[in-house]
């Protein structure tokens, strides 16, 4: 196995399994054909054809669209199609920085192929032998990817909060990192992928942050979502990423990006440019 295997797993996607979801003239998602057939039961919200699913144009603003889609999501929840409500609203954007076309419950986003955004932070300790990386293990009772390894801090990007403020909030909740340290987190870029998941399409963007931590600081979880933290040499971290599937799928890409930016992957290796290109699809 290799870094390219992890990248390929995050980009396993069959476009033929979906039809586009269109709102206000923009393609903003993709719906599996089976769900598209179910959406025919909501003619006051969607128009469904063999080629696409359209959110009706009678909804004139983000609030109206959000309310209409939420009514459908509630029915899909009752049917057991959408599961694990998070009570967290994700923005539905045409482009990053735009005003949202509407908002959607986080758990429903992949069912509609909505691009989700998140923040992932690699916390590291500088040493003469290269960085040591704080690795989290997700709580065994988490509804998604329980017990898997994770980045030091990570979370979804909901409506109503900026990226850096969200990262600072997540730093405290997930790792007990106080404000005076967390505010030093630097956004260093983003990784993207397009992946077929159990619930639908995940065409997501994760903003990557780095945070150098003092040697005497130990993360501690405060919200029950992390069972433990490990401080690993970067070489061990890279080996686990390349040779196993112990990390949650997108965390692998965040760490590979970290290895590249910190000069830890040899640029003379034959697959170097494929790795670099694969992080942003």
Predicted regions: what they are:
Residues 173:
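Catalytic-pocket segment enriched in acidic/His residues
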Residues 231:
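Short aromatic/basic micro-patch
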Residues 1-148, 156-169, 177-220, 224-226, ...:
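N-terminal leader/linker segments that precede catalytic domains of diphosphate-processing enzymes
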């Amino acid at each position: 196995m290799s870094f390219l295997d992890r990248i390929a797993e995050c980009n396993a996607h069959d476009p033929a399994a979906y039809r586009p979801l269109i709102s206000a003239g923009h393609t903003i998602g993709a719906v599996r054909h089976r769900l598209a057939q179910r959406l025919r039961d909501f003619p006051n919200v969607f128009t469904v054809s063999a080629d696409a699913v359209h959110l009706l144009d009678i909804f004139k603003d983000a609030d109206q669209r959000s309310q209409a889609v939420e009514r459908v999501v509630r029915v899909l929840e009752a049917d057991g199609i959408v599961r694990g409500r998070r009570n967290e609203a994700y923005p539905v954007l045409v482009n990053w920085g735009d005003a949202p076309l509407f908002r959607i419950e986080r758990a429903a986003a992949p069912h509609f192929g909505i691009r989700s955004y998140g923040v992932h932070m690699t916390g590291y300790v500088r040493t003469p032998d290269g960085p040591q990386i704080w690795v989290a293990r997700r709580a065994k009772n988490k509804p998604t990817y329980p017990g898997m390894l994770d980045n030091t801090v990570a979370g979804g990007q909901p409506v109503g909060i900026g990226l850096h403020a969200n990262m600072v909030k997540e730093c405290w909740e997930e790792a007990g990192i106080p404000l005076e340290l967390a505010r030093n987190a630097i956004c260093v870029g983003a990784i993207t992928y397009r992946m077929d998941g159990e619930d639908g399409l995940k065409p997501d963007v994760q903003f990557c942050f780095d945070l150098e931590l003092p040697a005497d600081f130990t993360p501690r979880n405060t919200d029950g979502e992390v069972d433990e933290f490990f401080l690993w040499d970067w070489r061990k971290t890279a080996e686990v990423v390349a040779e196993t599937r112990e990390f949650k799928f997108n965390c692998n890409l965040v760490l590979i990006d970290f290895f590249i930016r910190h000069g830890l992957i040899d640029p003379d290796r034959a697959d170097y440019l494929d790795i670099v290109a694969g992080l942003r699809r």
